[in-house]
Amino acid sequence: QVEGVVTLSQEDNGPTTVKVRLTGLTPGKHGFHLHEFGDTTNGCMSTGSHFNPKKLTHGAPEDDVRHAGDLGNIVAGSDGVAEATIVDNQIPLSGPDSVIGRALVVHELEDDLGKGGHELSLTTGNAGGRLACGVVGLTPI
């Protein structure tokens, strides 16, 4: 079972820092995305598509053309643990494109970052099924 904690923080209008620690993953790369809905009534399937307010195609976190929710891959070691710190400018915690109330999803496969040539590369990165998800909420600091 995949479980863990992901913490998002942002100072003023700066980038958002995402700290990830997940356990129970298969070793290797796993797509990690912010999805549009914080709805887990049907498990992770009801979180919708990648958060994409600019209506662009899927890409890598460093690409100009990408979904705002495209956070790339996290890497699990042989122990199934993935730890990462992601700093991103497209997932603010306030304003019209705030990600609070949306969902983070870890996928079963590696995200090809839109460059794999698969029919799903430009929409999902061909990252496979949804292993685990959580809604971005507010907690005291």
UniProtKB/Swiss-Prot annotation:
Compartment(s): Plastid, Chloroplast
Catalytic activity: 2 superoxide + 2 H(+) = H2O2 + O2
Cofactor binding description: Binds 1 copper ion per subunit. Binds 1 zinc ion per subunit.
E.C. number(s) listed in UniProt: 1.15.1.1
InterPro entries for this protein: SOD-like_Cu/Zn_dom_sf, SOD_Cu/Zn_/chaperone, SOD_Cu/Zn_BS, SOD_Cu_Zn_dom
A GO CC annotation given for this chain: chloroplast
One GO MF term: copper ion binding
One Pfam family cited in the UniProt record for this chain: Sod_Cu
UniProt: Zn(2+) binding residues: H50, H58, H67, D70
Location, primary (coarse class): plastid
Binding sites annotated in the UniProt record for Cu cation: H33, H35, H50, H107
Entry keyword set: Antioxidant, Chloroplast, Copper, Disulfide bond, Metal-binding, Oxidoreductase, Plastid, Zinc
Family that this chain belongs to: Belongs to the Cu-Zn superoxide dismutase family.
Purpose of the protein: Destroys radicals which are normally produced within the cells and which are toxic to biological systems.
Name by which UniProt lists this protein: Superoxide dismutase [Cu-Zn], chloroplastic
